[in-house]
Amino acid sequence: MSEGLTGVVLAHTEVAEAFVAAVEAIAGSDHGLVAVSNEGCDRAALTARLDAAVAARPAVVFADLPGGSCAFSAAAYARTHPHVRVVTGVNLAMLLDFVFHRDLDPAAAAARAAETGRGSVTVVGGAAA
């Protein structure tokens, strides 16, 4: 992996930490991901946590739910930080794709990760319709 973009996994309770731990178990510790939880904070505190995680670097924020507080906070943050892109509906496949393509610019990395994430969602098993 390479130096490059920061990925911020922004999620409810311990979900962000679990995603980052899973990526580390699969891809190693040089992943560029930071876990941020919304637990116990209001919107201002969540924005402060996000700002500390991004630390003025080019970044992609991966939020858990498209319509949740994490996604709303990330979208508001990105509107005032042009070097930040937001992807919602985070899954492990998109995070793994991101960590191996941190050399891209935020827009390209976000688009690639979102496409990988969408493509990884399948229905397996059961009777054919």
Task: Enumerate the predicted regions with their spans.
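N-terminal loops that bind phosphate or other acidic moieties
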Residues: 1-129
